[in-house]
Every structure is written in C-alpha cells, then in structure tokens.
Amino acid sequence: MGRRPKEAIQKSIPSSENGPRVTHETASGQIYKVTENLKTKKHTLWKNLDGGWQKLKSADSPYDLYELIDYDN
C-alpha cells in the first residue's frame, strides 16, 4: 500500500465549499475549519498553515472529521 501524498496548500478554501463553515481552535492556537459542499453533501476538514489551507479529509458527516482535530489534550 502506498501512502497518499500530502495535499497541496491552497491560498483559500475553494468556492465549491459553499455551505456552513465551522471553525475549531486548539489550545495551542492551531485553526481548523469544517466546510460543506452543498451540491455533493460532503464535508471537508481543512487545517490552517502558513500561506493557506491544507485539505485533510472529506466525509459524508462532519462528525467523522472531528476525531482528526488535535485539541492538545
């Protein structure tokens, strides 16, 4: 099994992610956003990095993405 290459950093979240956006901030200040594409009904987790946003994963439900956020427990 090969590893998937990391997603490229995008300057902004694509306009196709046109549904509600929920921002999560960890104790260390790392910012994540969960977005929704209203056409496909898919939710996507994005991580804020210097220079833009990195797409981490897409899922049918936003609840499937929350476990990927490191809340600095």
Predicted regions and their residues:
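A short, charged, amphipathic alpha-helix used as a generic interaction element across diverse proteins
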Residues: 19, 43, 50-52, 57-73
